Amino acid sequence: MVVVFENKAEQEVLGSPDAPYLTSLSASGARFTEFRAVAHPSQPNYLALFSGSTQGVTDDSCPQLLGGRPNLAQRLMSAGCTFVGHSEDMPTAGFTGCTDSTGRYARKHNPWVDFANVPASSNLPFTDFPRICPGCRRSPSSFRAFAT
């Protein structure tokens, strides 16, 4: 599981009464507190984290259509694992728009949507995470990520 905090300091989230589940997860995992951006603005960093490369993307424009290029989800699925990405403020499962009607969701934080070799069924709202993810504790063949 990878949890990405953007625009919030770690201490604003972990230990917060509004984030008990994330706080409980942090106690049993590795924390990469020195991870730094490879580019600015946001989107190239999410692509680099997810695929090992910025894919030549230098801005937050939408959509990026990156076809079947190698990425974390594709590699996990090729190894018999599962991948599900959860995105904060995404309005519905499988949503591929650039933003929602409120302007709170931004696809630039959701890199798996840009790759044709990641199934649309892997793209879920953050609100589904607490309901679905408890099973990932028991299953070593599951990987879940979400962006904030």
Each language-model region and where it sits:
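N-terminal pro-sequences and low-complexity stem/linker regions of secreted or lumenal proteins
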Residues: 1-148
